[in-house]
Protein backbone atom coordinates (compact mmCIF):
# COMPACT_ATOMS: atom_id res chain seq x y z
CA UNK A 1 0.00 0.00 0.00
CA UNK A 2 1.30 3.45 -0.85
CA UNK A 3 2.47 5.63 2.00
CA UNK A 4 -0.10 8.00 3.43
CA UNK A 5 0.11 11.69 2.59
CA UNK A 6 -1.14 14.59 4.71
CA UNK A 7 -4.44 15.97 3.43
CA UNK A 8 -6.47 17.64 6.15
CA UNK A 9 -6.27 18.77 9.76
CA UNK A 10 -7.63 17.11 12.88
CA UNK A 11 -11.41 17.03 12.86
CA UNK A 12 -12.01 17.51 16.57
CA UNK A 13 -9.57 20.36 17.00
CA UNK A 14 -7.81 18.30 19.67
CA UNK A 15 -5.18 16.45 17.63
CA UNK A 16 -2.32 18.74 16.71
CA UNK A 17 -0.99 16.69 13.83
CA UNK A 18 -2.66 16.55 10.42
CA UNK A 19 -4.89 13.68 9.43
CA UNK A 20 -3.17 11.36 7.01
CA UNK A 21 -5.08 10.20 3.96
CA UNK A 22 -4.10 7.20 1.85
CA UNK A 23 -2.53 8.32 -1.39
CA UNK A 24 -5.04 6.25 -3.33
CA UNK A 25 -7.80 8.51 -2.04
CA UNK A 26 -6.16 11.93 -2.03
CA UNK A 27 -8.41 14.80 -3.11
CA UNK A 28 -6.78 16.38 -6.15
CA UNK A 29 -7.15 19.92 -7.37
CA UNK A 30 -9.61 20.18 -10.18
CA UNK A 31 -12.64 22.00 -11.51
CA UNK A 32 -14.89 20.41 -8.89
CA UNK A 33 -12.73 21.90 -6.05
CA UNK A 34 -13.12 18.65 -4.13
CA UNK A 35 -10.08 19.33 -1.97
CA UNK A 36 -11.48 22.68 -0.90
CA UNK A 37 -14.80 21.07 -0.01
CA UNK A 38 -13.10 18.44 2.12
CA UNK A 39 -11.15 21.10 3.98
CA UNK A 40 -14.37 23.04 4.56
CA UNK A 41 -15.96 19.87 5.94
CA UNK A 42 -13.03 19.37 8.30
CA UNK A 43 -13.40 22.94 9.53
CA UNK A 44 -17.13 22.42 10.09
CA UNK A 45 -16.51 19.21 12.02
CA UNK A 46 -14.02 21.08 14.23
CA UNK A 47 -16.72 23.57 15.14
CA UNK A 48 -19.41 20.93 15.70
CA UNK A 49 -17.23 18.74 17.92
CA UNK A 50 -15.88 21.47 20.20
CA UNK A 51 -18.82 21.15 22.55
CA UNK A 52 -18.45 17.40 22.98
CA UNK A 53 -15.13 17.53 24.74
CA UNK A 54 -14.00 19.48 27.73
CA UNK A 55 -13.86 23.21 27.21
CA UNK A 56 -10.14 23.77 27.12
CA UNK A 57 -8.36 26.71 28.72
CA UNK A 58 -4.87 28.09 28.38
CA UNK A 59 -3.14 24.91 29.51
CA UNK A 60 -5.48 22.39 27.88
CA UNK A 61 -7.79 21.92 30.83
CA UNK A 62 -11.55 22.19 30.99
CA UNK A 63 -13.28 25.11 32.61
CA UNK A 64 -14.66 23.72 35.84
CA UNK A 65 -18.15 25.17 35.56
CA UNK A 66 -18.47 23.95 32.00
CA UNK A 67 -17.49 20.32 32.53
CA UNK A 68 -19.91 18.03 30.78
CA UNK A 69 -21.62 15.52 33.02
CA UNK A 70 -22.09 12.04 31.66
CA UNK A 71 -25.77 11.26 32.25
CA UNK A 72 -26.73 8.07 34.00
CA UNK A 73 -28.80 6.15 31.50
CA UNK A 74 -31.22 3.45 32.50
CA UNK A 75 -30.87 0.46 30.29
CA UNK A 76 -33.93 -0.84 28.62
CA UNK A 77 -33.87 -4.33 27.25
CA UNK A 78 -35.73 -3.90 24.04
CA UNK A 79 -36.76 -6.17 21.26
CA UNK A 80 -35.11 -4.70 18.22
CA UNK A 81 -37.16 -4.32 15.10
CA UNK A 82 -34.79 -5.04 12.18
CA UNK A 83 -34.03 -1.82 10.36
CA UNK A 84 -31.29 -2.25 7.76
CA UNK A 85 -29.60 0.59 5.95
CA UNK A 86 -31.46 1.16 2.68
CA UNK A 87 -30.46 2.70 -0.63
CA UNK A 88 -32.74 5.63 0.14
CA UNK A 89 -31.10 6.39 3.50
CA UNK A 90 -27.71 5.87 1.90
CA UNK A 91 -28.36 8.40 -0.84
CA UNK A 92 -29.59 10.94 1.69
CA UNK A 93 -26.47 10.56 3.83
CA UNK A 94 -23.71 10.58 1.23
CA UNK A 95 -21.86 13.82 0.57
CA UNK A 96 -18.47 15.38 -0.10
CA UNK A 97 -17.59 14.19 -3.61
CA UNK A 98 -13.84 13.84 -4.14
CA UNK A 99 -11.50 12.52 -6.78
CA UNK A 100 -9.91 9.16 -6.04
CA UNK A 101 -7.01 7.10 -7.30
CA UNK A 102 -5.42 8.66 -10.37
CA UNK A 103 -7.97 11.46 -10.43
CA UNK A 104 -10.11 10.00 -13.21
CA UNK A 105 -12.89 8.80 -10.90
CA UNK A 106 -14.97 10.36 -8.14
CA UNK A 107 -16.48 8.97 -4.94
CA UNK A 108 -18.38 10.23 -1.93
CA UNK A 109 -16.16 10.27 1.15
CA UNK A 110 -18.61 11.33 3.87
CA UNK A 111 -21.66 9.46 5.17
CA UNK A 112 -24.04 10.52 7.94
CA UNK A 113 -27.08 8.62 9.17
CA UNK A 114 -28.01 9.71 12.69
CA UNK A 115 -31.20 8.72 14.52
CA UNK A 116 -32.40 6.33 11.81
CA UNK A 117 -33.03 3.32 14.13
CA UNK A 118 -30.53 1.34 12.06
CA UNK A 119 -29.71 -2.21 13.16
CA UNK A 120 -27.73 -3.31 10.08
CA UNK A 121 -25.23 -1.34 7.98
CA UNK A 122 -24.13 -4.12 5.61
CA UNK A 123 -24.83 -1.90 2.62
CA UNK A 124 -21.94 0.37 3.62
CA UNK A 125 -19.25 -2.20 2.92
CA UNK A 126 -19.41 -1.43 -0.81
CA UNK A 127 -18.47 2.21 -0.25
CA UNK A 128 -14.77 1.64 0.26
CA UNK A 129 -13.74 5.27 -0.29
CA UNK A 130 -15.61 6.64 2.73
CA UNK A 131 -13.39 8.61 5.11
CA UNK A 132 -15.88 10.23 7.51
CA UNK A 133 -18.78 8.20 8.93
CA UNK A 134 -21.31 9.26 11.57
CA UNK A 135 -23.81 6.59 12.69
CA UNK A 136 -24.74 8.09 16.05
CA UNK A 137 -28.02 7.40 17.86
CA UNK A 138 -28.98 4.19 16.10
CA UNK A 139 -29.47 0.59 17.34
CA UNK A 140 -26.24 -0.92 16.08
CA UNK A 141 -24.65 -3.93 17.75
CA UNK A 142 -22.20 -4.85 15.01
CA UNK A 143 -19.65 -2.70 13.16
CA UNK A 144 -18.07 -5.49 11.10
CA UNK A 145 -19.33 -4.07 7.76
CA UNK A 146 -16.92 -1.16 8.31
CA UNK A 147 -13.92 -3.47 7.98
CA UNK A 148 -13.86 -2.90 4.22
CA UNK A 149 -13.59 0.89 4.64
CA UNK A 150 -9.81 0.94 4.63
CA UNK A 151 -9.67 4.68 3.86
CA UNK A 152 -11.69 5.60 6.96
CA UNK A 153 -10.20 8.48 8.98
CA UNK A 154 -13.03 9.51 11.32
CA UNK A 155 -15.78 7.40 12.87
CA UNK A 156 -18.54 8.36 15.28
CA UNK A 157 -20.97 5.74 16.58
CA UNK A 158 -22.18 7.34 19.82
CA UNK A 159 -25.42 6.21 21.40
CA UNK A 160 -25.76 2.74 19.92
CA UNK A 161 -26.01 -0.73 21.52
CA UNK A 162 -22.40 -1.81 21.12
CA UNK A 163 -21.02 -4.11 23.82
CA UNK A 164 -17.47 -4.26 22.48
CA UNK A 165 -15.01 -1.78 20.97
CA UNK A 166 -13.31 -4.54 19.00
CA UNK A 167 -13.03 -3.86 15.27
CA UNK A 168 -10.83 -5.09 12.48
CA UNK A 169 -7.72 -2.93 12.24
CA UNK A 170 -8.22 0.08 9.96
CA UNK A 171 -4.87 1.46 8.79
CA UNK A 172 -5.79 5.16 8.56
CA UNK A 173 -8.42 5.55 11.29
CA UNK A 174 -7.32 8.42 13.53
CA UNK A 175 -10.40 9.59 15.42
CA UNK A 176 -13.13 7.36 16.81
CA UNK A 177 -15.97 8.08 19.25
CA UNK A 178 -17.83 5.17 20.84
CA UNK A 179 -19.47 7.21 23.60
CA UNK A 180 -22.69 6.19 25.37
CA UNK A 181 -22.82 2.56 24.31
CA UNK A 182 -22.77 -0.59 26.49
CA UNK A 183 -19.10 -1.41 26.12
CA UNK A 184 -17.65 -3.40 29.02
CA UNK A 185 -14.09 -4.02 27.86
CA UNK A 186 -11.67 -2.27 25.53
CA UNK A 187 -9.80 -5.17 24.00
CA UNK A 188 -9.30 -5.31 20.26
CA UNK A 189 -8.62 -1.62 19.56
CA UNK A 190 -5.53 -1.86 17.36
CA UNK A 191 -5.73 0.91 14.76
CA UNK A 192 -2.08 1.98 14.33
CA UNK A 193 -2.75 5.67 13.54
CA UNK A 194 -5.48 6.19 16.14
CA UNK A 195 -4.83 9.52 17.88
CA UNK A 196 -8.14 10.33 19.57
CA UNK A 197 -10.40 7.75 21.26
CA UNK A 198 -13.61 8.53 23.16
CA UNK A 199 -15.27 5.81 25.24
CA UNK A 200 -17.12 8.00 27.70
CA UNK A 201 -20.40 6.89 29.20
CA UNK A 202 -19.91 3.14 28.86
CA UNK A 203 -19.54 0.30 31.44
CA UNK A 204 -15.80 -0.24 31.32
CA UNK A 205 -14.35 -1.60 34.58
CA UNK A 206 -10.70 -1.96 33.58
CA UNK A 207 -8.30 -0.47 31.06
CA UNK A 208 -6.05 -3.53 31.04
CA UNK A 209 -7.27 -4.53 27.58
CA UNK A 210 -5.68 -1.55 25.85
CA UNK A 211 -2.99 -2.65 23.42
CA UNK A 212 0.03 -0.55 24.32
CA UNK A 213 2.12 -2.03 21.53
CA UNK A 214 -0.37 -1.06 18.82
CA UNK A 215 -1.81 2.23 20.12
CA UNK A 216 1.48 4.07 19.88
CA UNK A 217 -0.15 7.10 18.18
CA UNK A 218 -2.87 7.68 20.80
CA UNK A 219 -2.74 11.25 22.16
CA UNK A 220 -6.22 11.72 23.64
CA UNK A 221 -8.20 9.15 25.63
CA UNK A 222 -11.67 9.91 27.01
CA UNK A 223 -12.96 7.41 29.59
CA UNK A 224 -15.21 9.66 31.63
CA UNK A 225 -18.36 8.17 33.13
CA UNK A 226 -17.37 4.51 33.23
CA UNK A 227 -16.82 2.06 36.13
CA UNK A 228 -13.04 2.11 36.41
CA UNK A 229 -11.65 1.34 39.87
CA UNK A 230 -7.97 1.79 39.01
CA UNK A 231 -5.74 3.42 36.41
CA UNK A 232 -3.90 0.15 35.72
CA UNK A 233 -3.52 -0.52 32.00
CA UNK A 234 -3.22 3.10 30.89
CA UNK A 235 0.51 2.90 30.23
CA UNK A 236 0.37 4.59 26.81
CA UNK A 237 3.65 6.39 26.08
CA UNK A 238 2.35 8.97 23.57
CA UNK A 239 -0.76 9.93 25.57
CA UNK A 240 -1.08 13.68 26.22
CA UNK A 241 -4.64 14.15 27.51
CA UNK A 242 -6.39 11.63 29.75
CA UNK A 243 -9.99 12.12 30.96
CA UNK A 244 -11.07 9.82 33.80
CA UNK A 245 -13.73 11.87 35.61
CA UNK A 246 -16.86 10.24 37.04
CA UNK A 247 -15.47 6.76 37.63
CA UNK A 248 -14.87 4.81 40.86
CA UNK A 249 -11.08 5.07 40.90
CA UNK A 250 -9.61 4.53 44.35
CA UNK A 251 -6.01 3.72 43.42
CA UNK A 252 -3.48 5.15 40.97
CA UNK A 253 -1.42 2.45 39.29
CA UNK A 254 0.73 2.12 36.19
CA UNK A 255 1.25 5.85 35.62
CA UNK A 256 5.03 5.63 35.28
CA UNK A 257 4.87 5.20 31.50
CA UNK A 258 2.90 8.42 30.88
CA UNK A 259 5.97 10.51 30.17
CA UNK A 260 4.25 12.80 27.66
CA UNK A 261 0.99 13.33 29.55
CA UNK A 262 0.18 17.04 30.03
CA UNK A 263 -3.43 16.92 31.25
CA UNK A 264 -5.05 14.47 33.69
CA UNK A 265 -8.68 14.64 34.85
CA UNK A 266 -9.67 12.59 37.91
CA UNK A 267 -12.68 14.59 39.05
CA UNK A 268 -15.45 12.77 40.94
CA UNK A 269 -13.64 9.57 41.81
CA UNK A 270 -12.90 7.88 45.15
CA UNK A 271 -9.27 8.83 45.77
CA UNK A 272 -8.23 9.28 49.39
CA UNK A 273 -4.48 9.12 48.84
CA UNK A 274 -2.23 10.37 46.06
CA UNK A 275 0.22 7.49 45.90
CA UNK A 276 1.06 6.52 42.34
CA UNK A 277 2.37 9.75 40.85
CA UNK A 278 6.03 9.56 39.86
CA UNK A 279 8.87 11.72 38.56
CA UNK A 280 8.71 10.09 35.12
CA UNK A 281 5.49 12.09 34.55
CA UNK A 282 7.72 14.98 33.62
CA UNK A 283 5.26 16.78 31.31
CA UNK A 284 2.13 16.83 33.50
CA UNK A 285 0.99 20.45 33.84
CA UNK A 286 -2.70 20.23 34.76
CA UNK A 287 -4.25 17.90 37.34
CA UNK A 288 -7.93 17.90 38.29
CA UNK A 289 -8.72 16.10 41.57
CA UNK A 290 -11.99 17.83 42.35
CA UNK A 291 -14.64 15.94 44.35
CA UNK A 292 -12.53 13.11 45.71
CA UNK A 293 -11.86 12.14 49.35
CA UNK A 294 -8.46 13.74 49.95
CA UNK A 295 -8.55 14.84 53.58
CA UNK A 296 -4.93 15.73 54.35
CA UNK A 297 -2.64 18.26 52.72
CA UNK A 298 0.17 15.80 53.38
CA UNK A 299 -1.24 13.86 50.44
CA UNK A 300 -0.75 16.97 48.30
CA UNK A 301 2.95 16.87 49.22
CA UNK A 302 3.19 13.67 47.16
CA UNK A 303 2.68 15.81 44.05
CA UNK A 304 6.16 17.29 44.54
CA UNK A 305 7.44 14.55 42.22
CA UNK A 306 5.70 16.29 39.27
CA UNK A 307 8.27 18.83 38.04
CA UNK A 308 6.02 20.64 35.53
CA UNK A 309 2.76 20.79 37.51
CA UNK A 310 1.38 24.33 37.16
CA UNK A 311 -2.40 24.03 37.66
CA UNK A 312 -4.18 21.96 40.31
CA UNK A 313 -7.86 21.57 41.21
CA UNK A 314 -8.71 20.35 44.73
CA UNK A 315 -12.16 21.85 45.24
CA UNK A 316 -14.74 19.73 47.06
CA UNK A 317 -12.12 17.63 48.85
CA UNK A 318 -12.04 17.71 52.69
CA UNK A 319 -8.53 19.22 52.59
CA UNK A 320 -9.82 22.31 50.78
CA UNK A 321 -11.64 23.31 53.99
CA UNK A 322 -8.43 23.56 56.01
CA UNK A 323 -7.29 26.93 57.33
CA UNK A 324 -5.00 28.87 54.97
CA UNK A 325 -5.60 26.17 52.38
CA UNK A 326 -4.25 28.09 49.38
CA UNK A 327 -1.08 29.21 51.11
CA UNK A 328 -0.44 25.75 52.56
CA UNK A 329 -0.71 24.17 49.11
CA UNK A 330 1.72 26.76 47.74
CA UNK A 331 4.15 26.01 50.58
CA UNK A 332 4.20 22.40 49.41
CA UNK A 333 4.17 23.12 45.66
CA UNK A 334 6.10 26.38 45.07
CA UNK A 335 6.05 26.06 41.27
CA UNK A 336 2.24 25.95 41.15
CA UNK A 337 0.69 28.88 39.28
CA UNK A 338 -3.02 28.20 39.73
CA UNK A 339 -5.15 26.47 42.34
CA UNK A 340 -8.85 25.85 41.65
CA UNK A 341 -8.74 28.05 38.54
CA UNK A 342 -7.37 31.09 40.38
CA UNK A 343 -3.84 32.37 39.93
CA UNK A 344 -1.83 32.88 43.08
CA UNK A 345 -1.42 36.51 44.14
CA UNK A 346 1.99 37.96 44.96
CA UNK A 347 1.11 38.32 48.64
CA UNK A 348 0.14 34.63 48.80
CA UNK A 349 3.41 33.66 47.18
CA UNK A 350 5.40 35.88 49.57
CA UNK A 351 3.63 34.42 52.61
CA UNK A 352 4.20 30.87 51.37
CA UNK A 353 7.90 31.55 50.83
CA UNK A 354 8.22 32.93 54.36
CA UNK A 355 6.44 29.93 55.92
CA UNK A 356 8.46 27.47 53.85
CA UNK A 357 11.76 29.10 54.83
CA UNK A 358 10.82 29.15 58.50
CA UNK A 359 9.86 25.46 58.46
CA UNK A 360 13.08 24.54 56.69
CA UNK A 361 15.09 26.38 59.34
CA UNK A 362 13.17 24.62 62.11
CA UNK A 363 13.77 21.24 60.50
CA UNK A 364 17.47 22.01 60.16
CA UNK A 365 17.69 23.01 63.82
CA UNK A 366 15.96 19.79 64.86
CA UNK A 367 18.37 17.72 62.77
CA UNK A 368 21.38 19.52 64.26
CA UNK A 369 19.99 19.02 67.74
CA UNK A 370 19.45 15.31 67.08
CA UNK A 371 23.00 14.95 65.75
CA UNK A 372 24.33 16.74 68.81
CA UNK A 373 22.45 14.38 71.14
CA UNK A 374 23.89 11.36 69.34
CA UNK A 375 27.43 12.75 69.61
CA UNK A 376 27.09 13.34 73.35
Regions found by a protein language model. Name each.
Residues 146, 167, 209-210, 233, ...:
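Short, function-defining helix-loop hinge/capping sites that tune catalysis or transport
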Residues 2-188, 192-229, 237-245, 262-263, ...:
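The feature captures the LRR N-terminal capping module
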Residues 237, 253-316, 325, 330:
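Structured C-terminal portions of repeat-based eukaryotic scaffold domains
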Amino acid sequence: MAAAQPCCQSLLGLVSSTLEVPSSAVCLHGEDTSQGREREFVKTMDEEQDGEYDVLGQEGEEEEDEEEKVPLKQEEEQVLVPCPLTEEILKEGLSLLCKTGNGLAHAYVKFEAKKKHLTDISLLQRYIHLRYVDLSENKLRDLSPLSSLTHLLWLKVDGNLLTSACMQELPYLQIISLAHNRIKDIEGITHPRLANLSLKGNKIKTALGLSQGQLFSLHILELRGNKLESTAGLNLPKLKNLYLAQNAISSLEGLEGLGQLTTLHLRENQLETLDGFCSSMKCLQYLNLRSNGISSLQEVAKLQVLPMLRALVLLDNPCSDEADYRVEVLVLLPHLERLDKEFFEEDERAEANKIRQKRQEEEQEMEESADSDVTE
